[in-house]
């Protein structure tokens, strides 16, 4: 019997180990744009491909979905190829911003590039997270929250600060799948965030709603009541989605955890691989920085300053102290911690004492090295002999009977009154 993969009931499938959360959320965003929608089998196949691709992480620095698609085996089952095509199209649609050329001097030629000076950093063209886009297969009516759905969402954002990229992208995915009303969003906010965060979000949302009502929104009727009331109508899909965008935008004004940078104390261990250390930094910044804060300069700075001394020497020697993250990872890719040889510290042996040993009375050795056995503290309690211990007492040893001589035992088997026959040449027998 083959394994049956139903449609995914969990709003946020678990990411494979070793993949950053914001990268996994990009794959989910692309998967939910497919028509028909993804199933659990598609997510299972996607995780299998990513686990194999993570063994050669050259496509991640920076992330290159075209290179990842080339690693996909031909005729791979599931909708993995379609998911990668959506990511490739989204990546190519974003225009790149080329760096301005350096000013040229007409008098002299530019000097040769110094290998010790790192090249200028070029911003990656790939977006950190994909924007929310509702797929064509959105149901006409929304799905109300269930307790298992709220618990799954809260588990995903438990380690992320409100307003961080991981928090926002997780909420975007939940909004995209369930298409909640204003009442559902309020319930979600109260379930996920504290009362202080909910109060700050409510204030920011009120100001955004007032501005939107003044500006005018497609489908909004001022005579039908406030925008919050009209967004509760399940039939008003367009107006409800406008309210969802305002509700998500209100998180941008929340104070993130960047004031207390716990990620600044993340240091590379003496024997920790460099790519593992960079991945820990990446995850910590995703969970701590507010949305919109540039992460790459902070990540590159910490990837050098918080590395161990051996990796810092490698980066300095190759001029990658402020280079793109991919160059830094390649510089320390072949680094392995040095084998720490254990030095055996031999304690010098003390010279023999001049005093006589208290056991045998001879000089030249310590009492612990004396060949004479230790004398008993008193007489034996069994036989009162002061020359041996109780364990050596002959009374404790069982008496072994002496074996009888073999000749006597043989003689006992012979009869005593049988005459010995006499043989003679002419006589009687």
Curated annotation (Swiss-Prot):
Disordered: annotated span: 93-143
- A Pfam family of this chain: Gag_p24
- Name the residues where the record annotates lipidation as N-myristoyl glycine: 2
CCHC-type Zn finger ranges? 355-372, 378-395
Q: What is this protein called?
A: Gag polyprotein
Per UniProt, the short sequence motif PPXY motif occupies residue numbers 118-121
- Motif window: PTAP/PSAP motif: 124-127
Q: Where is this site: Cleavage?
A: 130-131, 344-345
- From which organism does this entry originate? Human T-cell leukemia virus 1 (isolate Melanesia mel5 subtype C) (HTLV-1)
Phosphoserine modified-residue sites: 105
Reading the lineage from the top rank, the first entry is Viruses
Q: Which InterPro entries match?
A: D_retro_matrix, Gag_p24_C, Primate_lentivir_Gag_pol-like, Retrov_capsid_C, Retrov_capsid_N, Retrovr_matrix, Znf_CCHC, Znf_CCHC_sf
| Gene responsible for this protein | gag
GO molecular function terms listed in the Swiss-Prot or TrEMBL record? nucleic acid binding; structural molecule activity; zinc ion binding
Listed under GO biological process in this entry are: viral translational frameshifting
- GO CC annotations? viral nucleocapsid
Question: Which keywords belong to this entry?
Answer: Capsid protein, Disulfide bond, Host-virus interaction, Lipoprotein, Metal-binding, Myristate, Phosphoprotein, Repeat, Ubl conjugation, Viral nucleoprotein, Virion, Zinc, Zinc-finger
As a miscellaneous remark, the entry gives: HTLV-1 lineages are divided in four clades, A (Cosmopolitan), B (Central African group), C (Melanesian group) and D (New Central African group).
């Amino acid at each position: 019997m083959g394994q049956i993969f139903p449609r995914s009931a969990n709003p946020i499938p678990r990411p494979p180990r070793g993949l950053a959360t914001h990268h996994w959320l990009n794959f989910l965003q692309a998967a939910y744009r497919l028509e028909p929608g993804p199933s659990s089998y598609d997510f299972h196949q996607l995780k299998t491909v990513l686990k194999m691709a993570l063994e050669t992480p050259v496509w991640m620095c920076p992330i290159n979905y075209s290179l990842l698609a080339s690693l996909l085996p031909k005729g791979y089952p599931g909708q993995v190829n379609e998911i990668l095509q959506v990511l490739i199209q989204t990546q190519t649609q974003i225009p790149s911003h080329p760096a301005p050329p350096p000013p040229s001097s007409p008098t002299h030629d530019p000097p040769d590039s110094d290998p010790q000076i790192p090249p200028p950093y070029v911003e990656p063209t790939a977006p950190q997270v994909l924007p929310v886009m509702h797929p064509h297969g959105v149901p006409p009516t929304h799905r109300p929250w269930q307790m298992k759905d709220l618990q799954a969402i809260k588990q995903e954002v438990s380690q992320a600060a409100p307003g961080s990229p991981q928090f926002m992208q997780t909420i975007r995915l939940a909004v995209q799948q369930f298409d909640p009303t204003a009442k559902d969003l309020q319930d979600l906010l109260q379930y996920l965030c504290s009362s202080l965060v909910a109060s700050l979000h409510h204030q920011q949302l009120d100001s955004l709603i007032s501005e939107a009502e003044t500006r005018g929104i497609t489908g909004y009727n001022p005579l039908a009541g406030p925008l919050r009331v009209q967004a509760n109508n399940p039939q008003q899909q367009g107006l409800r989605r406008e309210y969802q965008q305002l509700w998500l935008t209100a998180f941008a004004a929340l104070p993130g955890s960047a004031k207390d940078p716990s990620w600044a104390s993340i240091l590379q261990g003496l024997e920790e691989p460099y790519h593992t250390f960079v991945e820990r930094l990446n995850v910590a910044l995703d969970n701590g920085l507010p949305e919109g804060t540039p992460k790459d300069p902070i990540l590159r700075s910490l990837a050098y300053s918080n590395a161990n001394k051996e990796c810092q020497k490698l980066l300095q020697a190759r001029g990658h102290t402020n280079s793109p993250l991919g160059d830094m990872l390649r510089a320390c890719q072949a680094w392995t911690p040095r084998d720490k040889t254990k030095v055996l510290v031999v304690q010098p042996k003390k010279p023999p004492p001049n005093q006589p040993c208290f056991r045998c009375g001879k000089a030249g050795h310590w009492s612990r090295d004396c060949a004479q056995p230790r004398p008993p503290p008193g007489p034996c309690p069994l036989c009162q002999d002061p020359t041996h211990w109780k364990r050596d007492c002959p009374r404790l040893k069982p008496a072994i009977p002496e074996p009888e001589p073999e000749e006597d035992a043989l003689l006992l088997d012979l009869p005593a009154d049988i005459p010995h026959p006499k043989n003679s040449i002419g006589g009687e027998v």
